[in-house]
């Protein structure tokens, strides 16, 4: 146990002025703090006052990250006190701005920075990390950060923010989490010329050297932390994201949140929307604006969900259309990847989205191309003309990249649009006086619960069924009252409860399918998982002190 000033410098131990007099004396920190004794609730109040005083979200982000650096328990107590308020600061959309200005926002290193020049020594670098038990890793190479492109080493803000939500939303213990940046360079010329840039100053290394780095990283992680260590891939470029997922998914405990997490939360929204449209998913025609990893991930999970309804895979695929930067994806068109070819249908080539919507007449329109304003007034009005209750998902992040706003959707569909977005939007009051609360299809509904469940039961491989199960659980948590208010997702204030339900369902299915490795199987899974959840309350550091009977300490001659 640390003593003296080291206690105050360790964010895992530091309680600030919440240390009692007895703790201060026993830990040799009496006199190193003002003679004031505050409860954690007062400390939260103090942080909130400072938070409200700031006018920019980037400054608020820096305030919260600085708190995380000095008092971890208080940081998570603040986050969980109002998750709806703080999630947009520690994650999307503010984390995107923080990543763009990471050189300015950088205060203290968090996580592990591994570069292409460290090949052959990654196992040694992992030993530098102070924690020997790691259950979850979020790793990025910074090539496709949100909808912002190649941010190189500045992308470290994403794994840091993601793991903060593992804890705040899912209760995964923060000291068992590790953010990792794999720095192979950047093709962003502005960053290469930026004197504040904190990463390698050369073009991205690709090819065999890149693959060798990834292989060594995966082997080193599992060698040190075990095959059950969850490795989440985050914000890799499309080509690498799919390739690496296919390469590693059956060998390691891994998933890609941009592909599978986004898919799960989108399908959850669709399943909830079906309670409004009163039909089956396989009755719908789905059109995607975008055909990258998010779109393809959602499309593949929709196919799985339709199959579960009893439709053949071929019939399900025919219900899904995609538009990429070159137009409608059709058979015979040039420049199609293997993933895109699956959703290429017999049709004339078309480029203009408005014309495509008129021709395909979709009942579901999903935007994941990070093209702000792509869903024009005409497109939204057409969707309302084709459908009694059109489903419109503008899932691109950050807010500036959203295909349309909630207000535009409701306005141009005469309030009939069923809307969800990737970034938060304010409530919208319709001309009839009814107020709708747009559903935010944030991946935060997915990955914390998935991580908690995977860790709790020791799942070694994460199949697509996990993400369909997760989508079903999320949709089940949406009440009729939520749907009446326009919400397709449970209120964010309930996200910890939702994560627990996801974790329990994942664990139940893992034990039923004999894919769990934590044995014996707990009799009460929910109680067991609840016992694993991180507590934001302070620990007591007062030594366990007691007396013996005086007679027991006497030596008789």
UniProtKB/Swiss-Prot annotation:
One of its GO terms (biological process) is malate metabolic process. One of its GO terms (molecular function) is oxaloacetate decarboxylase activity. It catalyses: (S)-malate + NADP(+) = pyruvate + CO2 + NADPH; oxaloacetate + H(+) = pyruvate + CO2. A divalent metal cation binds at residues 234-235, 258. Divalent metal cations. Prefers magnesium or manganese. Transmembrane segments: none annotated. The keyword Metal-binding applies. Gene3D superfamilies: Malic enzyme, N-terminal domain, NAD(P)-binding Rossmann-like Domain. The record marks 258 as: Important for activity. Signal peptide: none annotated. It is found in: Cytoplasm. InterPro entries: Aminoacid_DH-like_N_sf (IPR046346), Malic_enzyme_CS (IPR015884), Malic_N_dom (IPR012301), Malic_N_dom_sf (IPR037062), Malic_NAD-bd (IPR012302), Malic_OxRdtase (IPR001891), NAD(P)-bd_dom_sf (IPR036291). Its EC number is 1.1.1.40. Keywords: Cytoplasm, Metal-binding, NADP, Oxidoreductase. Pfam families: malic, Malic_M. Its cofactor is Mg(2+); Mn(2+). Its main location: cytoplasm. One of its GO terms (cellular component) is mitochondrion. NADP(+) binds at residues 144, 258, 290-307, 397. The active site is at 91 (proton donor), 162 (proton acceptor). NCBIfam families: PRK13529.1. Homotetramer. Belongs to the malic enzymes family. This is NADP-dependent malic enzyme. It comes from Anas platyrhynchos (Mallard). The gene is ME1.
């Amino acid at each position: 146990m640390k003593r003296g000033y080291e206690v105050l410098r360790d964010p895992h131990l530091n309680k600030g002025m919440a240390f009692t007099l007895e703790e201060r004396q026993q830990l040799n920190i009496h006199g190193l703090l003002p003679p004031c004794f505050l409860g954690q609730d007062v400390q939260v109040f103090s942080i909130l006052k400072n938070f409200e005083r700031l006018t920019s979200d980037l400054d608020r982000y820096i305030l919260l990250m600085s708190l995380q650096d000095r008092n971890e328990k208080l940081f998570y107590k603040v986050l969980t006190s109002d998750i709806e308020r703080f999630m947009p600061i520690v994650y999307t959309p503010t984390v995107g701005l923080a990543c763009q200005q990471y050189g300015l926002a950088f205060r203290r290193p968090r996580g592990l920075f591994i570069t292409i020049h460290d090949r052959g020594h990654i196992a040694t670098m992992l030993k530098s990390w102070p924690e020997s038990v790691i259950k979850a890793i979020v790793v990025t190479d910074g090539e496709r950060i949100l909808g912002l492109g190649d941010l190189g080493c500045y992308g470290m803000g994403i794994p840091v923010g993601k793991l903060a939500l593992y804890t705040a939303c899912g209760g995964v213990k923060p000291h068992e989490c590790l953010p990792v940046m794999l720095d192979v360079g950047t093709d962003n010329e502005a960053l290469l010329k930026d004197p504040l840039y904190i990463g390698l100053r050369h073009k991205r290394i690709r090819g065999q050297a890149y693959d060798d780095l990834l292989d060594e990283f995966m082997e080193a992680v599992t060698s040190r932390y075990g095959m059950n260590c969850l490795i989440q891939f985050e914000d890799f470029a499309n080509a690498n994201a799919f390739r690496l997922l296919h390469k590693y998914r059956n060998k390691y405990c891994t998933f890609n949140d941009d592909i599978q997490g986004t898919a799960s939360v989108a399908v959850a929204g669709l399943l909830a929307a079906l309670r409004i449209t009163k039909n089956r998913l396989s009755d719908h025609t789905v059109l995607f604006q975008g055909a990258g990893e998010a779109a393809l991930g959602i499309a593949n999970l929709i196919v799985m969900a339709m199959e579960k309804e009893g439709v053949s895979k071929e019939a399900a695929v025919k219900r899904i259309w995609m538009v990429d930067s070159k137009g409608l994806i059709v058979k015979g068109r040039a420049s199609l990847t293997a993933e895109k070819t699956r959703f290429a249908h017999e049709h004339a080539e078309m480029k203009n989205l408005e014309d495509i919507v008129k021709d395909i007449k979709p009942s579901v329109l999903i935007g994941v191309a990070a093209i702000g304003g792509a869903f024009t007034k005409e497109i939204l009005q057409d969707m309302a003309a084709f459908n009694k209750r059109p489903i419109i998902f503008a899932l691109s992040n950050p807010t500036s990249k959203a295909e349309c706003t909630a207000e535009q959707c409701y306005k141009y569909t005469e309030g009939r649009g069923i809307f969800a977005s990737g970034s938060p939007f304010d409530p919208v009051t319709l001309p009839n006086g009814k107020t709708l609360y747009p559903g935010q299809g944030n991946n935060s509904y997915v990955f914390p619960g998935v991580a908690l469940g995977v860790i709790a039961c020791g799942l070694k491989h994460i199949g697509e069924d996990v993400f369909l199960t997760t989508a079903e659980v999320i949709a089940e948590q949406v009440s009729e009252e939520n749907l009446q208010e326009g919400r397709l997702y449970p209120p964010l204030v309930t996200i910890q409860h939702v994560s627990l339900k996801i974790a329990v369902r994942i664990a139940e299915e893992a034990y039923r399918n004999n894919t769990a490795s934590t044995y014996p199987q707990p009799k009460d899974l929910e109680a067991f998982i609840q016992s694993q959840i991180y507590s934001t309350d302070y620990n007591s550091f007062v030594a366990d002190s007691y007396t013996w009977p005086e007679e027991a300490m006497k030596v008789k001659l």
